[in-house]
């Protein structure tokens, strides 16, 4: 399961969603100020500075570039 924590008007959030949809990955998209607050984000992703923040199988992996690298290693 992939969890994407994003925000509106975020090209890399959109790219992460598109990659997951295209490849048929099981994923959930959570949006800032709808599904979580900044404070909750920082609790779950200490040191987070950019969007999206992504978790794969319960492990924080980083942003879109890290998701793309994970995808290419499969």
PLM feature spans:
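Conserved residues at beta->alpha junctions
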Residues: 7, 32, 58
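Short alpha-helical
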Residues: 11, 36, 62
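Alpha-helical elements of the RecA-like P-loop NTPase motor core of helicases
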Residues: 14, 39, 69
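Conserved beta-strand scaffold positions in the cores of enzyme catalytic domains, especially
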Residues: 27-29, 60
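Non-catalytic, surface beta->alpha helical segment in thiol-disulfide oxidoreductase systems
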Residues: 56-74
